[in-house]
Design a protein with these regions (language model features):
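Acidic, metal/ion-coordinating pockets
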Residues: 1-219
Length: 219
């Protein structure tokens, strides 16, 4: 894809004339080199060299050019290093700024191979790192206190009018022999403690939701 195509959203119909616009960018700290960036008519991916105000305006212009009234906008960001358990301050500033400018209804982050904490800012969910659901890392083993065999599905319920978050359910899975299944009780408890600890630092927390995982609580 050339630069225009790389920055263009995927458009999915939601019914009733509404659409979901999915925009995607990556950053060099995720391991994507700047040489892969689409430029002019040269193929590549959409890269934000830095998470600064200029990058914010780049995203804002692309969203504003494509968005129609009623559209739901997801900004998907492949950012940050692997095997990290803290959300970098520049990611928090950038994601919050996208919400404050009315650019993103959902910020969907990914790169680290394990789930990272979730924040709700201005009524909008910021998933800093969704981890891996299916990967080919089975057998590599844990990195420190982190592990890649545990992943999550995230189910978001948003208000139809203003797209504010109403509910966020999280269902954990464990990868065994390249198949997804229910995690062991010990693995599920470990993941719950890890996620809840990080979420509480961002003003959110996890609450058990029957046998199928957790739901997010926020102030």
């Amino acid at each position: 894809a050339d630069e225009a195509a790389a920055c263009a959203p995927a458009v999915l119909p939601l019914g009733g004339g509404q659409r979901l616009l999915l925009f995607a960018w990556t950053t060099p700290d995720s391991g994507v080199p700047l040489a892969w960036a689409a430029e002019g008519h040269a193929g590549g991916v959409a890269v934000l060299p830095r998470l600064d105000e200029r990058a914010t305006q780049v995203v804002a212009r692309q969203v504003q050019a494509a968005r129609r009234p009623g559209d739901l906008v997801v900004v998907s960001l492949h950012w940050g290093g692997n095997w990290v358990d803290l959300v970098p301050s520049e990611q928090r500033r950038f994601a919050r700024r996208l919400v404050e400018l009315g650019v993103a209804d959902v910020v969907h982050g990914h790169s680290a191979h394990h789930p990272l904490p979730i924040e709700v800012h201005g009524g909008r969910p910021i998933l800093y790192g969704c981890g891996d659901l299916i990967n080919d890392y089975e057998g590599i083993g844990p990195r420190g206190r982190l592990r890649s065999d545990l992943g999550c599905l995230y189910a978001l319920t948003l208000a139809r009018g203003d797209h504010r978050l109403q509910r966020l359910a999280i269902v954990p899975f464990q990868l065994r022999r390249f198949r997804l299944g229910h995690p062991s009780p010990a693995a599920e408890q470990w993941l719950e403690r890890l996620l809840d600890e990080g979420c509480r630092s961002l003003g959110t927390s996890l609450e058990r939701a029957g046998l199928d995982g957790w739901q997010l609580r926020w102030r």
